[in-house]
Regions:
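Active-site loop architecture of trypsin-fold serine endopeptidases
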Residues: 154-161
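Short strand-turn-strand beta-turns centered on an Asx-Gly dipeptide
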Residues: 110, 116-118
Length: 187
């Protein structure tokens, strides 16, 4: 009896072979499509980024995972106060900084404070300290460039040290903190 059962099972498998192959190839196509969509979303729309260091304290803490959106700056320019992910010229690592000045703005640092277009910048929402050892004569931000700083002014390598950030080095706008989940919030 076992031989007849085995023969019947093999016959059934032979009949189902084309259907199983089609189902397997459909599944593989589905997985490849899903992977391509995920790669496109990460490359062109959203990207998770981790905050490394304390340069954005207290707004962002070291180790927090952020949600970065990339489409905004494809249709509009960065604005004062935006928190962005960028690369410094001649550097490969990404960093997170706040936009302080946009093209055409005049910026200077004196007496421990930043002045924008001749007026002391109101930074009370994210900075309440005194900028130590940082005097900078007035400069004008060139076209298609930004002046960025970390919220933790005295512990941040930023435009005061590396110069203006060209638009082409802006990688996205920080929209939210995702991790740790207990600290999740919109920016």
């Amino acid at each position: 009896k076992l031989g007849k059962f085995r023969d019947a099972r093999e016959e059934l498998h032979k009949k189902d072979e084309p259907y199983r192959r089609a189902a397997n190839s459909d599944f593989i196509i589905y997985l490849l499509t899903l992977m391509a969509v995920a790669i496109c979303i990460r490359t062109f729309i959203f990207e998770p980024v981790q905050c490394i260091g304390d340069s954005m304290y207290p707004t962002l803490m070291n180790g927090e995972g952020m949600f970065t959106e990339k489409l905004t700056y494809a249709v509009c320019e960065p604005q004062h106060g935006d928190i962005i992910i960028c690369r410094y010229p001649y550097h490969t690592e990404k960093c997170v900084k706040r936009v302080i000045a946009v093209p055409g703005d005049r910026i200077s640092i004196s007496d421990g404070a930043i002045s924008l277009n001749g007026e002391k910048l109101d930074e009370s929402a994210y900075w309440s300290g005194y900028i130590e050892d940082s005097e900078m004569p007035e400069v004008t931000v060139p076209e298609r460039s930004l002046f960025v700083v970390g919220d933790n002014r005295n512990h941040s390598g930023d435009s005061r040290h590396v110069g203006f950030i060209p638009y082409c080095q802006v990688k996205g706008k920080v929209r939210a903190v995702m991790t740790p989940f207990s600290q999740a919030r919109w920016i």
